[in-house]
Amino acid sequence: MEQTYVMVKPDGVERGLIGEIVAKIEKKGIKLVAGKLMQIDRTLAEQHYAEHIGKPFFEDLIGFITSGPVFAMVLEGDDVIKTARRMMGKTNPLEADPGTIRAEYAIHTNRNVIHGSDSPESAKREIQLFFEPHEILSYEKAVDTWI
């Protein structure tokens, strides 16, 4: 079963959207196997966004992601990386398809509510960055027997 990392960013947490976003994900049949509300410090933010070091928007990105709490999650399911990315929608909420999380909740490209891993490699790296192995649970959902 594939796993991915998804994070409700500070703007989503501050606007009280965690529950709605998690509900949307779970209604799709995706399993939440880890989740925690946390404050990201600069060191962790720089590790997470290492590929953007040196880019003009880097300092603003670090400032934003450390500005308030985030809700970090590990999701599990068949093709969960692709499915979660499709559910999130395009980075720019004005270009996101109707019904996607960003189309419904994001206000601006720089305040787009949610982050999700874009590949199996980034998912593995981000999960290891934000979670200890013992924090990721294995369980069966009642609906699993029907799928």
From Swiss-Prot:
PROSITE patterns: NDPK, NDPK_LIKE. Its EC number is 2.7.4.6. It comes from the Bacteria. One of its GO terms (biological process) is GTP biosynthetic process. One of its GO terms (cellular component) is cytoplasm. It catalyses: a 2'-deoxyribonucleoside 5'-diphosphate + ATP = a 2'-deoxyribonucleoside 5'-triphosphate + ADP; a ribonucleoside 5'-diphosphate + ATP = a ribonucleoside 5'-triphosphate + ADP. Disulfide bonds: none annotated. Its main location: cytoplasm. NCBIfam families: PRK00668.1. Major role in the synthesis of nucleoside triphosphates other than ATP. The ATP gamma phosphate is transferred to the NDP beta phosphate via a ping-pong mechanism, using a phosphorylated active-site intermediate. Belongs to the NDK family. This is Nucleoside diphosphate kinase. It comes from Listeria innocua serovar 6a (strain ATCC BAA-680 / CLIP 11262). The lineage of its organism: Bacteria, Bacillati, Bacillota, Bacilli, Bacillales.
